[in-house]
Amino acid sequence: MEMKNVKLPKEEKIRLVTGKGEWNVNDLGGKLTSVRFSDGPHGLNMIDENGNRKKATIMPSLVVLANTWNLQLARLQGETIADECIENGTDVLLAPGVNIKRTPLNGRNFEYFSEDPYLSGVMGREYILGVQSSGVGACLKHYCANNLEFERYYQSSEVDERTLREIYLKPFEIALEAQPWTVMCSYNLVNGVYVSENKWLLTDILRDGFGFSGTVVSDWGAVHSPYRSVMAGVDLAMPEAVVYEAEKKDYEIHDLNAALEKGLLGEEALERAAGNVVRLTEKVAAADKQVRFSKEQRHENAVSIAKEGIVLLKNDGILPLKAGKYCIGGTCAVKPVAGNGSAYVAGDYVQRPLHELFRESGKAIEGKSFELWGKSSSSHDYKLLAEEAYSADGIILCVHGYKEGESFDRSSIAIRHRQEEYIMRLTELYDNVIVCVYEGSAVDMSPWIDRVRAVVFVGYAGEGTNEALCSVLVGDTVPSGKLSETFPCSLADAEATLGHGNGFVIPYREGQFVGYRYYDTFRKDVLFPFGFGLSYAKFEYSDLAVVKRGETGYEVSYTIENTSDLDAKEISQVYIRDVFAMVERPEQELKAFSKDFVKAHEKKRVRILLAADAFAYYSIPLKKWYIENGDFEIRVGASSRDIRLKQSIRIELPNETQVSQS
């Protein structure tokens, strides 16, 4: 093997396809450029050789980033984190994750974008472009169908091919347009085969189908059989020489050298894997690394993204806050919560308490904080708040749910019991209660939603959380975030959560009906629909036009009018419905969106091009994407349940053009 001027004997090729230590590629004693990996995706999570975690900017979690529906901000987040990768010697950031939020119980939902494959894919694509524009590699993960943390090392996602293609592989296919340097294969099995040993997924689809030409890296410890993984398409097993105890009964099978000698490992496969690792080192060596932002600017970037990612879910006219005095309850108002695991970031920015930010807002708003449910809190804190509230203009409760993080799933989607109890007690005494929810995924608010005046979904919004929230509450920022996932009325309404199946087998019985595709198709009531979010401004939609462009494309245009006195941003969403489908299809599917700034009392014409694949489904008999002739409905709305405009079109294609190139 020869890569440029690098000649490698068989022994060095074998060393190359497993990592060096916990985080590095084997540089073969200096023969190759060293490559260092570090975790993300909400900021650099890097542990040095002494076990110390580097300090970094805590960016909003991907759920908050997705709630912005802003592609420019997705790119900005990637650029911002790349700066700190450069400053700390990280060459490849292990992010982003584009796994679908199949169930609200997944403990890592806060690390993923959406329940929708299109939104997940395009946000992931822009994030990758941001990271790599600075000369740092991105790692697209966790490929694929890794949608629970429950027994993640051994669970098998049992999913039919059409569902796999349309829902779980589609976000990867879209994000791969950004050409990430690496893709990470996941821990789980798909239909009984470990992803790390699945040639159909890693080679036939990822490389031959999607055209990925970079390096396939295993998740840390996901390789059970080194030679089988190399044969399937894994290039680099991380970390160094990890083999599970259960497999050690026949260790020589896992020894790549022995497998090569026995003919179990083909020389061509080893050549491919080692070559892809060498090419990764060459990318690192050739990278033009550029730091864009100062430390202060990175913080401002975090705040800017958080402002657009906060979602106003309910408002009975109490927001924005008027001048007055407000009691603030909850530890999140002082120190916001965040998820754990690989996405943990050790921040060095000291967040300001919400009441201090109120005081400095210039809006004559005063706040006083009460801990309520922190470690040192007691019923005494509640009594103090209740007494103080008699002379206050309102109560702001900052609540959060049960622990979220890597390697475990949520036990509930409700907020913690004592917090719910205090909401119930305080709303019995006072009318003006506002609830701010700091959570990483869907929350069941049904027991108390009708008792409060306003609800703000803050999410895990990073080190700028309270600055962003204050700006929204006092009206300096007009909220523009919308939900990137459906909030069901209760956990029982979430079809995909009904049991873990039989042992380690997870049946995807719902098929393609994930998230709003399920709720909208089967007319299920929801607490808040996909794409929903309120604003202080008001928008009207009008004048939908759909014009054919080329043989299979369509231009969709419509007008958005801001009828309020406030300049604001609106997220409009374009859905497609196959009216008389020959196969089972959802009620509607998101195919495009636009986030537009519209000045008060002005209009904006939005134009979106829909390519042919927007109308396609995956045909099992044809083994291809197929566009069905017939009637389709173009829908434009403010959410999946708030469709403002509709227009029917008829597609009539000759047989030779009916197969999409997707």
Where are the predicted features?
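Glycoside hydrolase catalytic-domain context in secreted enzymes
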Residues: 1-617, 626-641, 653-662
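Extracellular and select intracellular beta-sandwich modules with Ser/Thr-enriched
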Residues: 643-647
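Short beta-alpha junctions and helix-cap segments that line functional grooves
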Residues: 620-622
